[in-house]
Amino acid sequence: MAGNCGARGALSAHTLLFDLPPALLGELCAVLDSCDGALGWRGLAERLSSSWLDVRHIEKYVDQGKSGTRELLWSWAQKNKTIGDLLQVLQEMGHRRAIHLITNYGAVLSPSEKSYQEGGFPNILFKETANVTVDNVLIPEHNEKGILLKSSISFQNIIEGTRNFHKDFLIGEGEIFEVYRVEIQNLTYAVKLFKQEKKMQCKKHWKRFLSELEVLLLFHHPNILELAAYFTETEKFCLIYPYMRNGTLFDRLQCVGDTAPLPWHIRIGILIGISKAIHYLHNVQPCSVICGSISSANILLDDQFQPKLTDFAMAHFRSHLEHQSCTINMTSSSSKHLWYMPEEYIRQGKLSIKTDVYSFGIVIMEVLTGCRVVLDDPKHIQLRDLLRELMEKRGLDSCLSFLDKKVPPCPRNFSAKLFCLAGRCAATRAKLRPSMDEVLNTLESTQASLYFAEDPPTSLKSFRCPSPLFLENVPSIPVEDDESQNNNLLPSDEGLRIDRMTQKTPFECSQSEVMFLSLDKKPESKRNEEACNMPSSSCEESWFPKYIVPSQDLRPYKVNIDPSSEAPGHSCRSRPVESSCSSKFSWDEYEQYKKE
């Protein structure tokens, strides 16, 4: 659990129901069990149970003489619910006596019982949340003028700057927010106005408004969008943020408005910044924060392309117990982010810190490819499914063709590591996904490989063909030709080949294969003399004739070692050549080539 809250006055709105003191739990159960109808345990069950079948199970416990309220709260507590969640339900029930028990037990939850008797639904919840003490951090109590966070912004400035929220200043809209742009004191801000069109929907979405406000007030990080101010004036609830001129990461990846594509060094910087923010939220005390809505559209970029994580309406708190997850009810708002959510969330509503890791893995894939999460062609396939299928069937190199073509290519080592990391983050099983600590370390170590001009070849298959200019200047560069032409050497190269074939000491070559060469039968002294007089040369000059060009699918140079095919007076003598490359040699491929 998050901590021991047995002492009076140690409760807060974030205290888990598991940590509810036994004495308080007993009093609460006695009050609710003694009431009938909407104020009793049945009224509580109507709001906590997902189906009437669950209510029937509670009735069986009651028939056995057990407390229906205790069973309800125990089941609800397994979803990581807090005292603040319980207070909201009790307020909906209108159960002032139960609220009085909780608020009198932990005075820090509310300044007085009067706060639950005045005003409407939003005002009650706002006062309830605005006086919370978590980890010795006090959220200041709001007033009619709202809260100013190191800012001189007033609500009148908002009204005048937006002309009373005129549509001309509307720059975005979501399910529960409208976003306006406003100029105040030569500074630009974004105003998120809470929608209150319908009373029932207002009550439904109010908790999401509080969730975002709570996270922004309690937790601060350079890569989390800071809150400039918030107001609750005349039933207008709004959050004020600094305006991010470079928009969202999604818009920049898609080059919306014909903007220039992001170079690779900015992209890796964005990934590192967001991973730091997520890592901070997952490890913050007293309980970790699950974002629940990580996407490229929820990552904002400032003037210097520094990333800012935003949108915490779906955020949930959980204790730091290992392998713990909570179950939530999916809403229509979360369905917009389903492409970023793992299967355990879509099917069962399970939410954990590994959910954020999965979502971040999808963002990495977007950054690498510049593609949308769902590809229109072919057949609206998910980007994640396409890349993982390629990795499993054709290997990691097959994904490199999906790198964003709008920017110059990056080193293979850099992109391969990021594709591998994205695949691990977006694993189907949550246990196989890395922690954000591991993700952050991998990103920081990968950043250094971006500044290497190219990757050193590890085998002949990774060796790049030289340019034509290089071929003209170096006559000994191999040239491609058929096997049948290997014995028809050019006159100018015949002597050079004979000299090199008579060298006694083995060469050091970059090839991974071990070759056997036929040597001319000559007196030992003559061979030694020729070997000493021959000048040193590179491995390419030593092994390949002039007319063989290395390709990406280069096979071993075949040399006839059959004694019967040698000229009279020569014997077949073989010796291996040392290799400086540690890559594996495909014997199956060599045998197949030999048969041809």
Curated annotation (Swiss-Prot):
Q: What is the effect of changing residue 467 to A?
A: No effect on the interaction with PIN1
Principal cellular location given in the protein's record: cytoplasm
Q: Which residues form the signal peptide?
A: none
GO terms under biological process: cytokine-mediated signaling pathway; interleukin-1-mediated signaling pathway; intracellular signal transduction; lipopolysaccharide-mediated signaling pathway; MyD88-dependent toll-like receptor signaling pathway; negative regulation of canonical NF-kappaB signal transduction; negative regulation of cytokine-mediated signaling pathway; negative regulation of innate immune response
Domain (Protein kinase) spans 165-452
Q: What is the effect of changing residue 110 to A?
A: Abolishes phosphorylation. Abolishes interaction with PIN1. Reduces protein stability
Enumerate the residues binding ATP: 171-179, 192, 295-298, 311
Q: Which GO terms describe its molecular function?
A: ATP binding; magnesium ion binding; protein heterodimerization activity; protein homodimerization activity; protein kinase binding; protein serine/threonine kinase activity
Q: Keywords in UniProt for this one?
A: Asthma, ATP-binding, Cytoplasm, Disulfide bond, Nucleotide-binding, Nucleus, Phosphoprotein
Q: Which GO terms describe its cellular component?
A: cytoplasm; nucleus; plasma membrane
| Phosphoserine carried by residues | 110, 467
Top-rank taxon: Eukaryota
Identify the residue position(s) of the site Cis/trans isomerization of proline peptide bond.
Answer: 110-111
Q: Which SMART domains match?
A: DEATH
Q: In which tissues is it expressed?
A: Expressed in eosinophils, dendritic cells and/or monocytes (at protein level). Expressed predominantly in peripheral blood lymphocytes.
What InterPro entries does the database record attribute to this sequence?
Answer: DEATH-like_dom_sf (IPR011029), Death_dom (IPR000488), IRAK3_death (IPR042747), IRAK3_PK (IPR042698), Kinase-like_dom_sf (IPR011009), Prot_kinase_dom (IPR000719)
- Disease in which the protein is involved: Asthma-related traits 5: Asthma-related traits include clinical symptoms of asthma, such as coughing, wheezing, dyspnea, bronchial hyperresponsiveness as assessed by methacholine challenge test, serum IgE levels, atopy and atopic dermatitis.
Q: Provide the domain comment.
A: The nucleotide binding domain binds ATP with low affinity.
Role of this protein: Putative inactive protein kinase which regulates signaling downstream of immune receptors including IL1R and Toll-like receptors. Inhibits dissociation of IRAK1 and IRAK4 from the Toll-like receptor signaling complex by either inhibiting the phosphorylation of IRAK1 and IRAK4 or stabilizing the receptor complex. Upon IL33-induced lung inflammation, positively regulates expression of IL6, CSF3, CXCL2 and CCL5 mRNAs in dendritic cells.
What is the designated name of this protein? Interleukin-1 receptor-associated kinase 3
Q: Which organism is it from?
A: Homo sapiens
